[in-house]
UniProtKB/Swiss-Prot annotation:
This is ATP-dependent Clp protease adapter protein ClpS. GO terms for biological process: protein catabolic process; proteolysis. Belongs to the ClpS family. Coiled coil: none annotated. InterPro entries: ClpS, ClpS_core, Ribosomal_bL12_C/ClpS-like. Binds to the N-terminal domain of the chaperone ClpA. Involved in the modulation of the specificity of the ClpAP-mediated ATP-dependent protein degradation.
Amino acid sequence: MATQKQDGFVLEAKRTRTRPPPLYKVLLLNDDFTPMDFVIVVLQKYFSMDRERATRVMLQVHREGMGVCGVFPRDIASTKVEQVVSFARQHQHPLACVMEEN
């Protein structure tokens, strides 16, 4: 650390630590109306999953009521939630997508 004298005082530079931004999980929530194939398309299109992984996540959503699509910084997570909900509404599906702090 650098020190310098000024008017009889010793000034010492303080090292600041930057923390990584908080991360958020993007979750899909199960419903009784959205087709499983549509959920797979969403996971492939917006979360860059291959078909096998998308199928596993879709089955988790179906069986457990929710599934994690990915973990992202807040702005990216928020954008993905908006994109998924908008895409689902355009195709007249009630698919719910939310984010929560990791």
